[in-house]
A protein has these predicted regions:
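Compact, charge-rich alpha-helical regulatory domains located at protein termini
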Residues: 1-38
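Conserved C-terminal alpha-helix-loop-beta "cap" of PLP-dependent enzymes
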Residues: 348-441
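Conserved PLP-enzyme active-site core in the AAT-like
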Residues: 15, 139-304, 373, 396-401, ...
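Short loop-beta-helix segment that forms the pyridoxal 5′-phosphate
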Residues: 102-106, 122-142
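N-terminal entrance/gating region of PLP-dependent enzymes' catalytic architecture
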Residues: 33-116
Length: 468
């Protein structure tokens, strides 16, 4: 803002006097003249507050409005409704601070939030131990690998290609530093290839990584796949979408040793892909190998309930070689948003939203499968996301508006991560996409398919004429 300065001339003189220096030049006399700028910074003239808002509005107008057309993007980040209570609580000064709450003297309110978050995540995953959160889903995958290798003393990691590509990439990066061997198992009809998975697990396998629902939206048989790992002494690690756990069996009941995931669907907006938070839950025997921080409930000398940082095996607190992580901020504010959202939903609401997603996804899937030029990539069961193959129009043309109809569909192109599905895309549903929005998407796909068929017919006719 024009003319604003944090220190007046009198302030500067007082500060110089306090350190026994009589001028700014004297303060910087040890800096060689040749490296000093010697002139004011070449900054544009300042703007008033109203002018700044006008400038920001001008820049924002160049963007596409994501709310102008129904969006069906998913692939790990979902446009869920964030209730007003989330912003109302997270914006309170007791929580919205510039300092990360990992010091031992953190407030009782901050510690209770961590404890409530851990309790909620343990409940929905069916595992007894949760930490206070991690950066995001993929880094939680790396932490799971580290824990599994430490517990088993093995260095082999096996990951299904149904796992999110970002998590697999992160595992591959960390495997280099861990000295681990990472192998991937392919998919068959949208599900992890069970025979290939069983064959890939060896005596040196520390952990098997699965995802449910997987990246294509398919619901995996975690109990069956996990048996292959458990039979050979490997840990079963499952990535989960928290919003599906109201209708799916929790991973802890399916034999998982560790469950982790991306917490963005809970109380966090898309925000250009972040920030978000990750969650990490495990069986109790792995408590002391858990990454990050764990808050506990206790009693003081007067018998009053209190909260403490029970465990924080970070490299800032203990010897580096014994640390389980070096996490700092831990995205505590984002995790707070997540537990507020869960509390707002309640147990009945959590189940209700899962059932709603399943109904709407089933409706969308059946409608799209009936459109000429599009077919389902697989027939495995799904909850809130599914894969579609376009046989009429290139996927990028659908997304860019270059399909002769001008439609620019907000769907995720599978070819980015799966070359074998170059003609495929993901359709994701949230509670913000109702039947009207699904019909809008289907109408756009029908127009695109019709335009593609017409263009192909015209090209064929032109080719026939030239041959004739």
């Amino acid at each position: 803002v024009a003319g604003y300065t944090p220190a007046t001339g009198d302030d500067r003189e007082a500060m110089l006097g306090a350190i026994g220096v009589d001028s700014i030049d004297k303060l910087f006399e040890q800096v060689p003249e040749e490296v000093r700028l010697g002139r004011p910074l070449a900054l544009e003239d300042g703007l008033s507050e109203s002018e700044v808002f006008s400038r920001m509005a001008e820049l924002a107008s160049k963007n596409r409005d994501p709310e102008g057309e129904p969006g069906f993007l998913g692939a790990g980040m979902y446009d869920h409704y964030v209730p007003a209570i989330v912003d109302a609580i997270t914006s309170r000064s007791e929580f919205l601070t510039p300092y990360t709450p990992y010091q031992p003297e953190v407030s009782q309110g901050g510690l209770q939030v961590m404890f409530e978050f851990q309790t909620a995540m343990s409940e929905i995953t069916g595992l007894p131990v949760s930490n206070a959160g991690l950066y995001e889903g993929p880094s939680a995958a790396a932490s799971a690998a580290y824990l599994a290798m430490a517990v088993t003393g093995r260095n082999g990691l096996v990951a299904s290609r149904g796992m999110h590509p970002h998590s697999r990439e992160t595992l591959a990066t960390h495997a280099v530093g861990f000295g681990a061997e990472l192998s991937e198992v392919g998919l068959e009809d949208g599900l992890t290839d069970a025979a290939a998975l069983e064959a890939a697990i060896g005596e040196d396998t520390a952990a098997v990584f699965l995802q449910n629902p997987n990246f294509l939206g398919s619901v995996e048989d975690i109990a069956r796949l996990g048996e292959f790992a458990s039979a050979r002494g490997a840990l079963v690690v499952v990535a989960v979408d928290p919003m599906t756990l109201g209708v799916l069996r929790p991973p802890g009941e399916c034999g998982a040793d560790i469950a982790f995931g991306e917490g963005q669907p809970l109380g966090n907006r898309l925000d250009f892909g972040g920030p978000s938070f990750g969650f990490f839950c495990a069986r109790e025997e792995y408590l002391r190998r858990m990454p990050g921080r764990i808050a506990g409930q206790t009693e003081d000398v007067d018998g009053r309930r209190g909260f403490v940082l029970a465990l924080q095996t970070r490299e800032q607190h203990i010897r580096r070689e014994k640390a389980t992580s070096n996490i700092c901020t831990s995205q505590a504010l984002n995790a707070l948003a997540g537990v507020i959202h869960l509390s707002w939903l309640g147990k009945a609401g959590f189940v209700e939203i899962g059932e709603m997603l399943a109904r709407r996804t089933d409706f969308a899937r059946r409608r799209i499968a009936a459109i000429d030029g599009f077919e389902l990539l697989h027939d495995a069961p799904v909850v809130r996301e599914f894969a579609v193959r376009s046989t009429s129009v290139p996927v990028e043309a659908l997304r860019s508006g270059a399909d002769a109809t001008g439609s620019r569909l907000q769907v995720y192109p599978l070819g980015r991560d799966y070359p074998e599905f170059e003609d495929g895309f993901l359709v994701a549903l949230t509670e913000q996409r109702d039947v009207k929005d699904i019909e809008w998407l289907c109408a756009a796909l029908e127009r695109s398919a019709a335009a593609g068929s017409a263009a192909a017919g015209a090209a064929g006719a032109g080719g026939a004429d030239s041959v004739a």
